[in-house]
Amino acid sequence: ARAATMLVERDLTDHIDLNFGCPVPKVTKKGGGAALPWKRDLFTDLVAAVVRACDQAGERAGREIPVTVKIRIGIDSEHETATDAALTAQKLGAAALTLHARTQNQHYAGRAHWDEIARLKDLLDIPVFGNGDVFEAADALAMLERTGCDGISVGRGAQGRPWIFRD
């Protein structure tokens, strides 16, 4: 929260994205990244603190600083955290949510579960962005059509293909 306040006060950001999507074992084995939403109280405290800090610092600076949250489906197929994390983030004032439609254990393997993006889109009142398996413009259009999501977050699909955003 202190870092978010500093960024807002120094006019170095127009939004803050809390990324709980990292599946890398050196991060998740310590409870960070994609594993953090499993720690519901800590997840709640972090999101609440950053939203509050951005609201307060933004008010002093005379501008709105939205906080967005990125999550994964969960740790694995038996430990789904997306529903609770998404509803919690919305309740705490997150401006939007991005779902990487894989579990932590999947890392980047297999197909992304776009149906989970559609499910969260139906569940939430805030904008939902989809992430996973978007490597070209046709993939982005397919995700928008299949899920009804409000936008696309491109990750690995832009590596070596920066023109994807132009397409």
Specify the residue positions occupied by each region the protein language model found.
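Flavin-dependent oxidoreductase catalytic cores
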Residues: 1-167
